[in-house]
Amino acid sequence: MRFRGSAGNSGYCVPPLGITTTLGFFKQELSEDSGVNSLHTVLVLLGLLGCTAIAAQPEQPVEVPPAINPHNVPANHDPYRFDVDKSVEQSVRLTHTPEGVRFTWPHMSATTWDTALLGVKSAGAESQPWIEVSTETASVRQFLDPYAVGIRWLNLSGLRNGLAAGSQVTVRANAVTLQGDEATVRLFQNRLDLRKPLLVIAPHPDDAEIAAFGLYADRESTIVTLTAGNAGSMNYRAQAADPPEHYRLKGYLRAVDSVVVPWQGGIPPDRSYNLGYFDGRLDVMYADPLRTIPEVYGPNTDVAPYRRANVGALLPNQSRTNTWNHLVEDIVTVLRKVNPAIIVMPDPRLDSHLDHEYAAVAVVQALERWDREATFLLYTNHAASNHYPFGPTGSVVSLPSIMPGSEEIRLQKVFSYETDRELQTRKLFALESMHDLRLSPEEQSSCDTPDFQRRSDDYPRMIEEDYFRRAVRANEIFYAFDRAGVQQVVAKFLASMTKTQDPPGSKQGDSSR
């Protein structure tokens, strides 16, 4: 059950949004290990301490988009196109049995691989579909989108130890129909040296943690957040009712979060830096690179109030106007100082948030003044449906589904980074530490007020995207490119944007993240 606030519904105090279901998962998982009993106790206590004023409603099934008609989409429809020289592909013969679909793991030229995908043909699905893939020693369960028509790529990377050539694999489907007598195995050898410097580019505070906390934790990582997060919901109006004052407060709080929360992943505050540019403005800045763009909710044009949250010396905390050219210049400075071997950034084709899309554009423009090679790991925190990834906390993440009729998505490689239970726990509480992922002090304290249930305004606030469910998973998924590849990705994105009719700034999306 997901708990969602709604004015007019009866409400009561429960742990913070997402913590309820997540605690249930960790209670079951952690109780199996005697060495983590104290950690389980901490989880429960921290969850119960967070009294959140929200109303309980069961999670509603994700509706099939009206444009999707399973009869009009062929089962072999696949929007993904993989570079043939970047992975190893082989077809396998499927045998349909009463217990499920079975196949034999093939002999393949890639003897060492880190990521494995299995492409199966889905002829349609019901609500909450999932597919479980099992070997003799382990199994993984992946939840699919509700329409699930066409090729779906299942992530088998967690079964690596049980996938020797000749081993038997069983595929069991629930509420989804698998079609055909063949499937495709695709293996990736990324050969990433995670001991080398790693740079995470986050459009907003909390994006680095949602996408890549497991990957960046306990490494030589630098976290750079482009905006202060000074937009979105008016969470703190009890403390600051005037919009400019409110969003100045909210932006500063979130800027502080972006600097200190990575410490929970072993990254000290002097290696986390917030550039302080303005949330919800990147596309407007890109459209006129020299123009100074004010905040969404006020006249301020200086990023310095938000850079005061920084403690490191990556960039000076001095007055600087909010322009596109300044943003790109700052990213160039970051690249030259950090010299990363791996750069983690949004994928503008798969992430529907404008700030995420143009964050990728800014990074690629900065590459023109930084001539080193690097591996680029792209992510999406806002796939076309904010329900992705589907399924509960702790389950496996694979490629997001793409609406039929969308442009093809070219991928060089896929990289699945596994996160064990301890790392998932740390990620959970890093997310919970972010101000914008929990309810405000007024919303939490409203649990104690007699008229809580009679509020007629938008309190308790509805939080539509459950980032605790979506982000705390058995793995983090990335789309790996070389320098030329990521430049092509952004060039294709910009070409597609010239076809749209929306002027810059007309589509704000969810500016809160």
Description of each model-found segment:
Residues 20-22:
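Alpha-helix boundary/capping motif
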Residues 33-43:
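Bacterial N-terminal signal peptides that target proteins for export
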Residues 42-50:
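Bacterial N-terminal signal peptides
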Residues 55-58:
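Boundary at the C-terminal end of the N-terminal hydrophobic targeting segment
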Residues 61-338, 360-369, 380-382, 406-416, ...:
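Active-site rim/loop-helix segments in enzyme catalytic domains that contact anionic ligands
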Residues 340-358, 363:
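C-terminal, well-structured subdomains that either form a transmembrane helix-short loop-helix hairpin
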Residues 370-393:
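Short, flexible loop segments at boundaries between secondary-structure elements
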